[in-house]
Amino acid sequence: MLPRIEALREIIWRFDNHSCVVSPLGYITRDLFSITAELRERCFYCMGSMGSVIPLALGISLARPQVHVLAIEGDGSLLMNLGALVTLRRYNTGQISLFVFDNRCYESTGCQPSQPDGFNIEDICGAMGLQTYVAKEPRHIEEFFKMRKASSEPTGVLVIKVALAPPSARVDEAPREIASRFSKWLCETSRTH
């Protein structure tokens, strides 16, 4: 299992000029916010909503096909909108990389179990027809990115097994400010590419 913040760093340092990230509510976004000060214009932190990452990532990729969207989702948040996986399978043109952080619980609200015994998020993603891979070490994330770069097809989903960990500080920006800054970046990106 990887520490959550280490997994985020492994993803984020691979950003390029055509990348943005969409993240879910809770500890994932708090950690992401703490390590992306210089990239915040390209980060959409979903605060206060579960199950919205995939629909937002799809909207961005369809409206701005030149943008590579790194969609980071938690296992609990993904379970709130499993239908989004079917939509992702249907409409992903290859510009979305989905990362599911799986700690098997709703960590942000007290670690209530998110999945029954014998249930695996990667099996659900695979059943939806998505190529699904599992990461338990940093090298697995690197291998996923190499595979994505070498393929013209959508690379599917990387389920990252993450360990429980104390969160970073709360996001200290208002959702309106986050949305405005991100929208501005998207508009500028469409003019320059």
Where are these regions (language model features)?
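Thiamine diphosphate
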Residues: 2-9, 34-189
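Non-catalytic terminal/interface segments that mediate subunit docking, oligomerization
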Residues: 12-16
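Generic C-terminal helix-cap and adjacent flexible tail
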Residues: 191-193
